[in-house]
Amino acid sequence: MKVVYFSFSGNVRRFIKRSEISDVMEITKDNCTDPFEEPYILVTGTIGFGEVPKEVQSFLEINHHNLRAVAASGNRNWGQNFAKAGRTISEEYHVPLLMKFEVQGSNKDVIEFKNKVGHFNENYEREKVQSY
């Protein structure tokens, strides 16, 4: 399953690169309104006072039907708004919040993310096979 991500300041991009997951796509201003026709896990940062970035909002308006899970980055200095974009997306689109990580994530966060994506993919593939 593809990992789709948005990186406002480069932190999420660095996190994804460190994860060494190869099946990825970056959301940009240029492609945020393009249709995306396959299941994906979304990774996004949080901006302002816990908001979902506009590019991610635009992407989800068109492509929410293929969203399977979300992970979010943030800064703990924002207290209850830490990585709030992930919780907002999870609640709005009824998908699991895989994890929250600070800024570009620690090595432990990267390992946790890879493991969760791997388990999520295994379960998704199993469900897909059982539906045939």
Swiss-Prot record:
Q: Which Pfam families match?
A: Flavodoxin_NdrI
The record's Gene Ontology biological-process terms are: protein modification process
Q: Which GO terms describe its molecular function?
A: FMN binding
Annotated family: Belongs to the NrdI family.
Q: What job does the chain carry out?
A: Probably involved in ribonucleotide reductase function.
Name it: Protein NrdI
Origin organism is Staphylococcus haemolyticus (strain JCSC1435)
